[in-house]
From Swiss-Prot:
Residues 28-680 are lumenal. The gene is GAUT3. One of its GO terms (molecular function) is polygalacturonate 4-alpha-galacturonosyltransferase activity. Expressed in roots, inflorescences, siliques, leaves and stems. This is Probable galacturonosyltransferase 3. Pfam families: Glyco_transf_8.
Length: 680
């Protein structure tokens, strides 16, 4: 017994485990227990888990089963803990080593070494343990040099595992960067291709986005007025005078309180009290006069009366807009008079007659860039010329052929005499000097002589004519029969020596060099233009009468329309195909206006049918004279912007946001403009 006690005392072991991380890793691994033997509970549950998960099979002498093993460890909170376990509770894989065989170790006495290879097959435990031991290897070796933490094979696996983790981390980072770059590129492409012409029409400031109750009281008070008038009419018909007077007084009070308010915020503080008072009056009227059938009749009469008023206001608005659009502003009229007076007073008319042949060679040189502008508006024409020259790379190669009427010829000549752009060549002609342009040759002039056409146009502003043909007011404008408007169909006759010419309207602004237009291969077509059709809009059936068999049998109703305003004409192909003859043929057929209304675009669509080359839309952006929601980027990137419509930039009707594109080419410091009070 003494021998056994001595031996037990001699072999009593104190195992110090540095478990700051190793213990935690084993705890978290939750690896399956293999061949565990029952052992008594330890003082701390965490230590129990350490031994239960790590002690796979202990090898020891059966006589030493009562030897105590004391272990220290750190729990999850960093506190140092002690635990005891009997040798008999450990697995057989635990071995006793004699320190005499450990040459590299200097400590004396027996040591207990945990053979980690005994649980290498446990994958989860291996991963977690290796992660913890890797971070704490140096520290453990310094504090506990007697503990063999891992075999060389285990260390190699740990190193390989760390390398794989590093490679995987780098791969994930690379994939994340690639994904971010792809998302950014997709977002950029989406933003570049995003069309916001429609979205631009919406704003959070629009009434659509106001609170639905923002004008609840205002609407209530207006509805009360309608109800009160209906009951008042019934009261009057039934000789209930007191109630009639009371209701009309309340109507007047409601109108006074409403005033010019457009929302509840504009109403005075007494509005709600007045609405309550009117509600009380309507309640009294309902109790005394309510008759469903009678009320329905009154409301129907009010509705019909209101509809008639709305129709009348629409007609009036249409007429006034058309009137304003075709009216020549007083400042522009002043400008023409001042220029014409100075032209003749200073004798420039005689001097020009002597010098008119000086630049004849340039005017007929087909290698230069020739423009045709037909207008009676001096200021508008000057903007077209200035914007073209200022944006041209070679202004000396640009030649402008301007044709105006007899009334504005002197003013146009005077303006370009004193304000001629540098280098460019300007020719101003009078349409009345074209003797070949007469009624025997020109269909439009011949039609103008008919009494029916004169009646249709020159009495268009008569009240009876307005009420009868309000829908056609746009076309009932004598300017549509002006020869300046139809001279575009006679370009080969006006310029017989030229091969190509660019036609420009006087309501356009040039923003880029137009010289590349002469290099476009039009593939044998006569007219180069930008198409205007979008979905079902601006197609042939919008302009032509397809109920007429002459139209329906020769043209496609769904054919895409295009725009006048900036058109490249191949005059050689024009002469070859006798385009002017085609125009005359269809113009004669439309003498009674059954094929199309009027204007120059419908006969243009017919004349150049299947002979029009579609140019890129960026060359010509239209709609600045009628559409307030155009794409701003498209406008700024366009070579030419066109103010087609009633809201011309020189009129007070113009859209303020579009006017700067035009006004920046106006010389507002010019003495003539200042004299006529033409300013921004």
């Amino acid at each position: 017994m003494t021998t056994f006690s001595t031996c037990a005392a001699f072999l009593s072991l104190v195992v110090v485990l540095h478990a700051v991380h190793v213990g935690g890793a084993i705890l978290e691994s939750q690896a399956p227990h293999r061949e565990l033997k029952a052992y008594r509970p330890l003082q701390d549950n965490n230590l129990q888990e350490v031994y239960a998960s790590s002690a796979a099979a202990v090898h020891y002498d059966p006589d030493l089963k009562d030897v105590n093993i004391v272990a220290t460890y750190s729990d999850h909170y960093g506190n140092i803990r002690l635990g005891r376990v009997k040798m008999g509770d450990l697995s057989p894989s635990w071995v006793l080593e004699n320190p005499a065989y450990q040459v590299s170790r200097k400590t004396k006495g027996s040591q207990l070494v945990i053979p980690r290879d005994s649980f290498q097959n446990d994958t989860g435990m291996e991963d977690n343990a290796s992660h913890s031991t890797t971070n704490q290897t140096d520290e453990s070796e310094n504090q506990f040099p007697n503990v063999d933490f891992a075999s060389p094979a285990k260390l190699k696996r740990q190193i390989l595992r760390q390398e794989r983790r590093g490679q995987r981390t780098l791969e994930l980072i690379r994939q994340e960067k690639e994904t971010d770059e792809q998302m950014q590129e997709a977002a950029i492409q989406k933003s570049m291709s995003f069309e916001n012409s429609v979205i631009g029409k919406y704003s959070i400031w629009r009434r659509d986005y106001e609170s639905p109750n923002a004008d609840a009281i205002l609407k209530l008070m207006r509805d009360q007025i309608i109800m009160a008038k209906a009951y008042a009419n019934i009261a009057k018909s039934k000789n209930v005078t007191n109630l009639y007077v009371f209701l009309m007084q309340q109507c007047g009070e409601n109108k006074r309180v409403i005033g010019k308010a457009t929302s509840d915020a504009d109403l005075p503080s007494s509005a709600l009290d007045q609405a309550k008072a009117m509600g009380h009056a309507l309640s009294l009227a309902k109790d005394e006069l309510y008759d469903c059938h009678e009320l329905a009749k009154k409301f129907r009469a009010i509705l019909q009366s209101t509809e008639r008023k709305v129709d009348g206001l629409k007609k009036k608005g249409t007429f006034l807009i058309q009137l304003a659009a075709k009216t020549f502003p007083k400042p522009l009229h002043c400008l023409s008079l001042q220029l014409a007076a100075d032209y003749f007073i200073l004798g420039f008319n005689e001097e020009d007659a002597v010098k008119e042949d000086v630049s004849q060679k340039k005017l007929e040189d087909p290698s230069l860039y020739h423009y045709a502008i037909f207008s009676d508006n001096v200021l508008a024409t000057s903007v077209v010329v200035n914007s073209t020259v200022l944006n041209a790379k070679e202004p000396q190669r640009h030649v402008f052929h301007i044709v105006t009427d007899k009334l504005n010829f002197g003013a146009m000549k005077m303006w370009f005499r004193i304000n001629a752009p540098a280098d460019a060549t300007i020719q101003v002609e009078n349409i009345n000097d074209f003797k070949w342009l007469n009624s025997s040759y020109c269909s439009v002039l011949r039609q103008l002589e008919s009494a029916r056409l004169k009646e249709y146009y020159f009495k268009a502003n008569h009240p009876s004519s307005i009420s009868a043909g309000a829908d056609n007011l746009k076309y009932r404008n004598p300017k549509y029969l002006s020869m300046l408007n139809h001279l575009r169909f006679y370009l080969p006759e006006v310029y017989p020596k030229l091969e190509k010419i660019l036609f420009l309207d006087d309501d356009i602004v040039v923003q880029k060099d137009l010289a590349p237009l002469w290099e476009i291969d039009m593939q044998g077509k006569v007219n180069g233009a930008v198409e205007t059709c979008k979905e079902s809009f601006h197609r042939f059936d919008k302009y032509l009468n397809f109920s007429n068999p002459k139209i329906s049998e020769n043209f496609d109703a769904g054919a895409c329309g295009w725009a006048f305003g900036m058109n490249m004409f191949d005059l050689k192909e024009w002469r070859k195909r006798n385009i002017t003859g085609i125009y005359h043929y269809w113009q004669d057929l439309n003498e009674d206006r059954t094929l199309w209304k009027l204007g120059s675009l419908p006969p243009g669509l017919i004349t150049f049918y299947n002979l029009t080359y579609a140019m890129d839309r960026s060359w010509h952006v239209l709609g600045l004279g009628y559409d307030p929601a155009l794409n701003q980027t498209a406008i700024e990137n366009a070579a030419v912007v066109h103010y087609n419509g009633n809201y011309k930039p020189w009129l007070g009707l113009a859209f303020a946001k579009y006017k700067p594109y035009w006004s920046k080419y106006v010389e507002y410091d010019n003495p003539y403009l200042r004299r006529c009070d033409i300013n921004e």
